[in-house]
């Protein structure tokens, strides 16, 4: 049984349970035993020695949701001994997760898989930091999620600036290197933007129309949030902002590598 499809099926089940909760005449009651019924068709097709292993994968997924605070053992509002495990209840945070249409930021494994499929050339450093960011977001460690997201974004920008530097011809290349080499990322980006603006109009149409959105808009927004998180500003971070940044990151990375490919083309 494929883990990704199993997780998707479990999420769909919890979504269905949430919809039942909207009916005042019904009270969702979930037991761990729902897994056997949910995967009855898949399990029945397996040899006997594989059935327990398949159910174990499903149980692991449920416990992962418990670990991030989306579920808790027991029934809501009950405190009697018989009302705890194997009963499970969707938490308020879980309701937020399962009700969301874009599920990927709440699924670290699925998020990285989708990112790699969309941007197969993504480098290991960027992938490592964005993976940390998604994992931290799911634990509600918003400071860590914001900082690691910012590092991933910065690394992509450094990759682009390097490709652009190699694309430039002298004397522009030498002058640009003197202004940007070994500087803070804010300085490097400022010099890059100033220089790149002169070349943006010659980009292919599909790259030309969005460069300010992806480079000036998304990169700067992520960088400023990272600065707020990385310094003792006391500013409260928004989970919705981190979620939105994680949503757009794959498109941002795709644009960076498309632009890099253009700059490296003969």
What function would you assign to each model-found segment?
Residues 46-56, 117-121, 192-223:
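Short, mixed-charge amphipathic alpha-helical segments
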Residues 21-50:
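Short acidic, hydrophobic short linear motifs in intrinsically disordered regions
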Residues 130-162:
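Short, hydrophobic, well-ordered secondary-structure elements
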Residues 2, 83-143, 251, 262, ...:
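Charged alpha-helical initiation segments
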Residues 1-32:
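Short alpha-helical segments that sit at the start of domains
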Residues 41, 163-212:
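Short, charged amphipathic alpha-helical segments flanked by flexible coils
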Residues 71-85, 205-266:
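Charge-enriched, short contiguous segments at helix-coil
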Residues 50-68:
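Short amphipathic alpha-helical interaction segments
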């Amino acid at each position: 049984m494929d883990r990704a499809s199993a997780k998707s099926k479990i999420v769909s089940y919890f979504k269905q349970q949430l919809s039942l909760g909207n009916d005042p005449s019904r009270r969702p009651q979930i037991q761990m035993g729902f897994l056997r019924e949910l995967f009855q068709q898949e399990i029945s097709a397996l040899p006997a020695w594989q059935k327990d292993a398949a159910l174990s994968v499903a149980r692991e997924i449920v416990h992962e949701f418990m670990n991030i605070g989306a579920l808790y053992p027991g029934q809501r509002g009950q405190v009697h001994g018989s009302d705890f495990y194997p009963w499970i209840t969707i938490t308020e945070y879980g309701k937020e997760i399962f009700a969301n249409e874009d599920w990927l930021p709440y699924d670290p494994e699925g998020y990285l898989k989708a990112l790699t499929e969309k941007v197969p050339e993504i480098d290991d450093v960027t992938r490592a930091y964005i993976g940390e960011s998604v994992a931290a977001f799911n634990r509600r460690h918003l400071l860590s999620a914001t900082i690691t997201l910012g590092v991933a974004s910065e690394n992509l920008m450094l990759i682009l600036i390097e490709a652009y530097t190699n694309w430039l011809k002298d004397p522009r290349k030498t002058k640009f290197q003197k202004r940007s080499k070994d500087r803070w990322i804010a300085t490097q980006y400022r010099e890059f933007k100033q220089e790149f603006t002169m070349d943006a109009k010659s980009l292919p149409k599909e790259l030309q129309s969005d460069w300010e959105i992806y480079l000036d808009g998304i990169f700067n927004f992520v960088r400023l949030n990272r600065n707020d998180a990385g310094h003792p500003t006391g500013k409260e971070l928004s989970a919705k902002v981190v979620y939105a940044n994680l949503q757009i990151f794959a498109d941002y990375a795709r644009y960076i590598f498309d632009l890099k490919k253009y700059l490296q083309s003969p």
